[in-house]
Amino acid sequence: MKKYQRLAEQIREQIASGVWQPGDRLPSLREQVASSGMSFMTVGHAYQLLESQGRIIARPQSGYYVAPHPVCRSVATAAHVIRDEAVDINTYIFEMLQASRDTSVVPFASAFPDPRLFPLPQLNRSLAQVSKTATAMSVIENLPPGNAELRYAIARRYAQQGITVSPDEIVITAGALEALNLSLQAVTAPGDWVVVENPCFYGALQALERLRLKALSIPTDVKEGIDLMALEQALQEYPVKACWLMTNSQNPLGFTLSAEKKALLVALLTHHNVTLIEDDVYSELYFGREKPLPAKAWDRDDTVLHCSSFSKCLVPGFRIGWVAGGSHARQIQRLQLMSTLSTSSPMQLALVDYLSTRRYDAHLRRLRRQLAERKQQAWQTLLRHLPAEVKIHHNDSGYFLWLELPEQLDAGELSAKALEHLISIAPGKMFSTSGAWTRFFRFNTAWHWGEREEQAVKQLGSLIREMLSAKSLV
């Protein structure tokens, strides 16, 4: 029996004997580490095992409690591999982004949803309305930390999920990427180590390159997410200052971390005094009944800088994002003043006007339904036209699919061939510091599906079959 299993059995016996009653709060992870002498992750896995058995439950920002009734849950398993890598992003990413801008190219490589899914007429009316009433003072009023009404509106949306965030700690930014970059800059210095997922969003790698930071890439599973055992190993071996992670609808894999894993993640980083920069731009694009909580929901020690935006769920062109910066909010404001000065005043005012109409949630419900339908349609189309050797990794949120080619094929080569036919895909090496994931590519399912898209998938299937035939002759 392993250590975490012995600890779980010990706690289970204590619950059975009445030492801990239903509803009782168990010792925190840190308290259990101190009393048992075991490692943080050993204790974390013991609690996770008990939770999977339905014997305890995790409550955001509160801790672990003895459950009144057993609830069956699954426990994540992961590999134990870690590597440290210097960051060097080549021009390949920029070439792919340029291809995505060409309207003659089928945009399966795009990171954005179909703009026709957004309520652009209503947003344009809001923009026209505020342009009529804007004054010279509007620019001053919308300097960092940003428009007060917009910050209050965002704070209220946190409150709807039971998360207390003061409007005063929210900084409005020019999209989520600025929020993430400013957050990273606020808690690191050149040469510091930063943890990223492997694979991860290429914007994170570009930010690390620009700020001359060093990356630790942690193995990340397409279903279960980041390997917490490997993360703990990295935190023990390297002086890590920050973690840049996606916890909901991760790009490019598409997974959403379980509530149990989010709780363990925050507790682990808090234990090691490492800041989590949470990239949560896809959190509204869930397909289930309830919106998944961000890791921020388990933050009681100012560990998490939560970053999001309206770009992926409402209006990309406005470039309005934010960070719930906690004690770092003032430093983030200062950094913003020294770089972009402030976020567009008319865009902030237009968003305030639109959000006041209460149409936002109705739009989100419609958007989620359309994205789910398009993802299902794309998946079925890919199954019909791609060779059986291609594996399609599917998650029930967001609008990305992660495709895996057979061993001998290279997605970069497929991408180059596809571009000759005006089809773009996002090869896996865009999402790694080392150029790994060469057999994988990300596929955007959010665009309108018609004859053009159907023929493009057929062409991809033909190209893959040609590559397989060529390899078999070697």
Language model: regions and residue ranges:
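Conserved core segment of the aminotransferase class I/II
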Residues: L123, R300-R369
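N-terminal basic, amphipathic alpha-helical segments
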Residues: M1-A128, Q333, L337-S344, R365, ...
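Hydrophobic residues in well-ordered beta-strands that form the structural core
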Residues: V196, S217, L276-E278, L351, ...
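N-terminal small-domain helix-loop-helix segment of the aminotransferase-like
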Residues: I82-G175, L182, S356, S424, ...
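Conserved core of the PLP fold type I
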Residues: M137-H272, E284-W298, L371, G461, ...
